[in-house]
Amino acid sequence: GLGGGFAGYGIYPEYADYYAFHVFFDTQAAKDECEREIEKHFDIVNLSKIPTRQHPRITDEPMIWRYFVAPLPTKLAASQLDEREFVARFVIRINHTLDGAYIFSSGKNMGVFKANGFPEDVGEYYMLENYEAYSWTCHGRYPTNTPGWWGGAHPFALLDTTVVHNGEISSYDANRRFIEMFGYSCDLLTDTEVITY
C-alpha cells in the first residue's frame, strides 16, 4: 500500500563521521527557522536538497533537504549529555516544537527515504539506484490505524536505528507515557514511534 520507505546503511562514506539529517519542510519559513536552530547547535559541513525525480504517483511533496552536521563542542559540553543523546534530544525538540519541519533521519552514514507512495515509486522518486549501501530496510505501507502523511511512512528512525513492523502495538499508550517521562515526545501519529525511541 501507500506509505513506502527505505533506510540505507553505508550510503554516505564521505561523511561517515557526521550526522545526516534528512528533513521535510512544509514552508520556506519552517526551513529558515529550522536551519537557524541547526546552526545554533551544530557545525553544518554540507547541506543540499535531496535529489529526487518527478514521479506521476508521488504528489504533494514537501521540500526535502539533508544536512551533514557535528555538534558544536561548546553546546555539547554545556548540555552535559553524551553526543548521541544531545542529537536525539535536538531531533525530538525540533519535531515537537517547530511546525512544518520534521527531521525524519538523523544517523551517521545512513539515511531514510520515505513518501506517500508505493515502495517501487518511492525508490524511483529518490533515485535510490544512485546509492550504495551494505544494508537496507524497507516497508510497503503506513502503520495500521494511522493517518497517511509523508512523515508517517515506515521506516521510523532516530540516530542509527530504524524500525519497520507489521500490525499494531497494542500497548502504545502505556509505552508512550513511559518514554515521555524521559523527555521523549511522540508526535508522529503512529505506534511505531515508541519502538524507535
Where are these regions (language model features)?
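Conserved short alpha-helical segments that host acidic/polar catalytic motifs at enzyme active sites
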Residues: 1-197
